[in-house]
C-alpha cells in the first residue's frame, strides 16, 4: 500500500498533491459523420495517458461556443481541425504543464479565461483557442483527475460539482430511433424521436429494451413501407421518407413498443430543434418547411397547443428545444402549462452558458 501511495502522491512542502500534467497531445480524428474532430491525450507525471474526443452537432445553436474549423475548402470541405490541434500543442500544452490533474476548475478557468480570453455578449466564447480544443483537453483532464483520486468518472464529476456522492441514480438512456429535421432527408421537421426505457431495472436492461424496440420498429417500417423506410439518418434513427408527420411517427413508435412486449416500460422524448424551422421575419414556425409548403405554419401558442395534444395522447416526458433559441417568452408559457408533466429542455436556448441559464431561470 505504501508503494502505491508514493506512486500516486507527491509531497511538496508538507502538502500532498496528485499527479501533474507532463504533456498534452492532440490530433485530428474522424467522427461518426465522417467529419474531423479533435482528440486529446493528457500524459501525467506517472506516465499514464488519458484520452478524450469531442462531439459536434449537425444543427447547432447560434449562441454555442465556437468550434474552431480551418475553413480550407480544399481539405475536408473546410471542416478540418488542424488549427485547433495546433492550439492544443502551442497554447494549452505549455501553459498547463505541471498543474495538479485534480485542479479541474483551475485548469478550465485558465484555458477559457486566461489563454483564450475571448468574450461576447453572453460571456466566454472560446473563439481564439476553439471550444473543440478546450473541451478535448478538459475531458481528458477529468479522466486523469478521476484516476488520481481512484474514483469512477461519474463519482468524480459529482464531487467536482458539489453534489451528493453517497447515492447515485442510474441515468436513463434516450435512444434516437426516428430522425427528422436536419438529420434526415424526409419531411419530418421534428429532429429526433427518442425512446426512454424508464421501466427498466438496470442500465443494461434499458439498453436491451431499447435495442429490441428499435429492431421491431425496423421490421414494422419495412412491412408497411418497404425496405427504403429502414434507411437511417444522421444519428442512426430511421429516416423513413414515407412518414408524413409527427402523429404517424409516434403511432409507429407505439406499435413497435407494443410488438416488442415492452408496453408501459418506455416513455418518449422529442428533440424538436425548432430554430431550424423558425422564420424570424414572421415570428412563426413552419412544420411543412422541408416540403417547400406553408400549410402548417404556426404561432408559438399554436405550437404549444400541438405539444400539449401530443403529450396527452402519447407518453411524452421530455421535449427539447420546442421553440427558437431566442424565444424565451414561449418557453416561459410552455413551462407554466406543461412543466409539471413534461421535462422541457433548453439546448440551443441555454447552450450551457451561465448567463443564458441565469436569464432562463429569471
How does the language model describe each region?
Residues 19-62:
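Structured beta-strand/loop patches that form or line metal/cofactor-binding pockets in enzymes
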Residues 31-32, 122-141, 173-185, 232-233:
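Glycine/serine-rich anion-binding loops at beta->alpha junctions
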